[in-house]
Amino acid sequence: MAAPSSLLLAALLWVPAEALSCYGDSGRPVDWFVVYKLPANSGSGDKPWKGLMYKYMDQNSEGWQDGVGHIDSKDGAVGLTLQPLYQKNSSQLAFLLYNDQPPKSSSAQDSSSRGHTKGVLLLDQEGGFWLVHSVPRFPSPASSGAYSWPPNARTYGQTLLCVSLPFSQFPGIGKQLTYTYPLVYDHKLEGIFAQKLPDLEEVTKGHHVLREPWNSSVILTSRAGTTFQSFAKFGKFGDDLYSGWLAAALGTNLQVQFWPNSPGILPSNCSGTHKILDVTETGFPGPSGPTFNATEDHSKWCVAPEGPWVCVGDMNRNKRETHRGGGTLCTQVPALWKAFRSLVKACKPC
């Protein structure tokens, strides 16, 4: 009886080599990963690689680790994950690439009327992944044929969160994107995908939610059973994502890292039940750090100082973005919360 049981267990644990999934720095499929691209002026390193170094973690790592190479390598986590997008045998795949600052190689133009939101969906009929990120001009369209890192994205810090998901979770993501109103600059959603994912098809046509409520949250379950919660708002929501909704929804104070170099920055807010503090300095653990100011960091994330929530997304805290779509993806994974909580070195008081 032992042999059949062993075979059954192996079948349940086996992941096909070509399964669409987030891929880690190890070169193997992972349930989720976070890549934190470091600012060019932080830490040490040879000049040619300035702005291409990154920190990495997934469900198997013990906190932050140095990236295995450089962010522009096709052999690192981000390059491996996006590789199927650029392969010729992608006829059975569906994908959406969206960015309010699309690559120059695409025909799309920057649009302040669309959501301030950036991401990648890549899937087949079994599932795929959602990559939520902060990187302008990224990634290059599928027709480019190869993964690359945009030169404009070397200077400042950036975050990328990838989650592997079964197909059943993509209708929920489609709903969320009708709220965030993304600028889709490249996509393929044909046949069975268009039939089963009608909201995503509407998104590719530039459609969005037409009636209240102007915000939406959806629970998503990763391929390995990790729970994430997506928060999305349309422009007519008319308020800051963090102080106007997220803190109350999560029931916690928040420390928020965002791009502070744009006009109309919203100050730290202690007027409500929960405090929203703007992060001013970020530092990685260890003697080499590095530590850097928020003015050098284009990433968008927040953490509950007392736990257990951490969120990675694509929205800043400024007046303009109170009237734009966007969102964030949150989780209560203890290791991920601990990793981000340790990054906060200073906040602007109320």
From Swiss-Prot:
Localization annotation: Lysosome
Keywords (A to Z) from UniProt: Apoptosis, Developmental protein, Disulfide bond, Endonuclease, Glycoprotein, Hydrolase, Lysosome, Nuclease, Signal
TM stretches of this protein: none
Superkingdom classification of source: Eukaryota
InterPro entries the UniProt entry points to: DNase_II
Predominant location category: other
Pfam families according to UniProt: DNase_II
Tissue expression profile of the protein: Ubiquitous.
Range of residues in the leader sequence: 1-19
UniProt-annotated catalytic positions: H298
Cellular component annotations (GO), alphabetically ordered: lysosome
Catalytic activity entry: Endonucleolytic cleavage to nucleoside 3'-phosphates and 3'-phosphooligonucleotide end-products
Enzyme Commission number, as recorded: 3.1.22.1
Glycosylation sites: N89, N215, N269, N293
Described purpose of this protein according to its UniProt entry: Hydrolyzes DNA under acidic conditions with a preference for double-stranded DNA. Plays a major role in the clearance of nucleic acids generated through apoptosis, hence preventing autoinflammation. Necessary for proper fetal development and for definitive erythropoiesis in fetal liver and bone marrow, where it degrades nuclear DNA expelled from erythroid precursor cells.
Family affiliation: Belongs to the DNase II family.
Protein name stated in the entry: Deoxyribonuclease-2-alpha
Lineage: Eukaryota, Metazoa, Chordata, Craniata, Vertebrata
